[in-house]
């Protein structure tokens, strides 16, 4: 990684907070948490490594967190409320700003399709507080409702399966303002 003060490249093994780690899986996604300053590294088959200057790196996996649906992390997104959304090769989860974890299980769409396994590639939240997911296998998924009240969640799918898109593979998504 690049050292901010000097601009020089530094191997992670030479960063004190990373000492003790033998090796790291391939990096897939990264985000810096706005309030805490933590940097979350989403890894291919390695979960999430949480870096906070001056502290030993924390390693989050499906075994020690309630929001990871798979250890293959493919997308990270922090919304304006401070909730950190995590897309994986297997689903979507969120660590709320208050530390509460939520894992999305089966999503039932209003056109009788359902999804228990999705490969999330990108995540964005719009001004209406809706979450949009780009997926490799189910096109775009639109989530409305309050994640703090799971019974209010509703899901809509835009994909080749329901003829709302010409493909099921969507790699990124952007909010047009």
PLM regions and their residue ranges:
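Carboxylate-rich, polar loop motifs that coordinate divalent cations or form catalytic acidic clusters
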Residues: 1-177
């Amino acid at each position: 990684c690049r050292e901010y003060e000097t601009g020089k490249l530094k191997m992670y093994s030479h960063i004190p907070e990373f000492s003790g780690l033998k090796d790291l899986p391939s990096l897939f996604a990264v985000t810096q948490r706005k309030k805490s300053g933590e940097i979350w590294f989403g890894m291919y088959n390695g979960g999430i490594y949480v870096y906070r200057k001056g502290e030993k790196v924390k390693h989050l996996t499906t075994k020690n967190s309630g929001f990871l649906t798979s250890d293959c992390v493919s997308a990270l997104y922090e919304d304006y409320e401070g909730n950190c959304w995590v897309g994986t090769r297997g689903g979507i989860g969120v660590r709320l700003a208050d530390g509460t974890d939520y894992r999305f299980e089966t999503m039932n769409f209003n056109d009788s399709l359902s999804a228990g396994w999705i490969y999330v590639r990108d995540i964005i939240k719009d001004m209406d507080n809706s979450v949009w997911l780009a997926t490799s296998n189910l096109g775009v998924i639109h989530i409305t409702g309050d994640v703090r009240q799971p019974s209010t969640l509703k899901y809509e799918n835009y994909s080749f399966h329901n003829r709302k898109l010409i493909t099921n593979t969507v790699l990124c998504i952007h909010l047009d303002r």
